[in-house]
């Protein structure tokens, strides 16, 4: 008989990001209306993330997820992390670029929105073409990982996986006929390797890579891309 003790570890896959009293919604809307500047928006976001970490720490989890907060949409956050931003949305700073993609402005239409796997949540659809220049931009992932580490929490960065990201995307308007975003999987996985390297260098011992698209019916070619 094996008398060795088995340890059960507890964690959660993610955490609600809107705030206990919908603080994020009010802060973002105030920013759009010009009543809260960029620094004020980030202060509100930081307070929500702090409350989230308080709750996760109090739950006694063995590992807490980081990178699950978003000002608007986690798929858009992933597009920013790999620099897959449509040229029409690029602005003078990251915040302006982010919200141009999310909401559009006087000069550019926003990204399309569609249902997240037939749920009531809608995500922003990235636009990918043969000439999309992917680059690793790990700033958000590193910052939120660092916030948890500063509290001495066993933090686990969470990323939307490259296969799901491309399957959730659509071909850019100027892409040639027959092009599919998944055609860029090799280039994108190289950028993900850079993101992972940055997280490991910052102290991450493991990273949660979500591939929800694999829960749906897929073609053989799509499955092979994994």
Residue ranges and their predicted role:
Residues 1-226:
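Domain-level signal for soluble alpha/beta catalytic cores
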């Amino acid at each position: 008989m094996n008398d060795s003790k088995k340890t059960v570890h507890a964690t959660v896959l993610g955490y609600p990001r809107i705030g206990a009293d919908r603080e994020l919604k009010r802060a973002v809307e105030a920013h759009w209306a010009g009543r809260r500047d960029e620094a004020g928006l980030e202060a509100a976001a930081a307070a929500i993330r702090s409350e989230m970490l308080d709750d996760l720490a109090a739950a006694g989890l063995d590992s807490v997820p980081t990178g699950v907060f978003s000002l608007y949409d986690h798929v858009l956050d992933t597009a920013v992390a790999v620099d897959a931003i449509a040229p029409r949305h690029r602005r003078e700073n990251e915040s302006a670029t982010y919200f141009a993609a999310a909401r559009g402005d006087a000069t550019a239409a926003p990204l399309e929105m569609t249902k997240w796997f037939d749920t009531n949540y809608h995500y922003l659809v990235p636009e990918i073409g043969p000439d999309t220049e992917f680059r690793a931009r790990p700033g958000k992932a590193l910052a939120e990982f660092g916030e948890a580490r500063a509290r001495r929490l066993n933090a686990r960065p969470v990323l939307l996986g490259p296969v799901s990201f491309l399957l959730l995307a659509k071909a850019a308007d100027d892409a040639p006929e027959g092009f599919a975003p998944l055609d860029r999987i090799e280039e994108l996985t190289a950028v993900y390797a850079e993101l992972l390297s940055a997280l490991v260098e910052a102290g991450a011992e493991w990273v949660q890579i979500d591939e929800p698209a694999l829960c749906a019916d897929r073609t053989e070619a799509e499955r092979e891309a994994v």
